[in-house]
Amino acid sequence: MTQNFTIRQARPEDDAARATLLAPTYGADAAGLAAEAADIRHHFRDFGDLAPGIVRLVAEDANGAILGALEATVRLYANGCESVGVMFLEGIAVAPSCRETGIAAALLAQLEDIAREAGITEIASDSRIDDAVGADFHLANGFSEAERVTCFVRKIDG
């Protein structure tokens, strides 16, 4: 099958399209995600378009339409990993009409190349415990289940 898309680093003008694709993955609204991307870019403007440790990739067709998006961060630790400094797949999404075309695999391959070039040896990810589709995606793309955890949050006043 001919690959009818290219993978590249996301640019600011991709924020709305990326947010539309990724919003269901994050259980968020697209406008909020696009605003968050702009806010991160503003806070890290001295570092160029991307904040340190944040990877944002898109799959784009010949007409410039965004068909898929991936976000990852470098974390010091991720559950189940053996190394310090782990690439963490925060979210990945492909337009419904473009699924099963190799876009997700190509996005993951590019992320792996970026991680390898940075000396990172593991990519981690997560999905909600009740998300069978997410679990199936990870397993089909070379991830193995490491552990199950319960997450907690403590708010800080002031």
Where are each of the predicted segments found?
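Hydrophobic adenine-recognition pocket in adenosine-nucleotide-binding enzymes
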Residues: 10, 92-94, 127
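Acetyl-CoA-dependent GNAT
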Residues: 5, 9-12, 24-84, 90, ...
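Conserved beta-strand-loop-alpha-helix junction that forms the acyl-donor binding cleft
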Residues: 125-134, 153
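Hydrophobic pocket/interface hotspot
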Residues: 18-22
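Conserved acetyl-CoA-binding loop-helix of GNAT-fold acetyltransferases
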Residues: 94, 100-113, 140
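Conserved GNAT acetyl-CoA-binding A-motif
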Residues: 115-127
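Conserved acetyl-CoA-binding loop of GNAT-fold acetyltransferases
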Residues: 139-148
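Conserved acetyl-CoA binding element of GNAT-fold acetyltransferases
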Residues: 83-96, 150
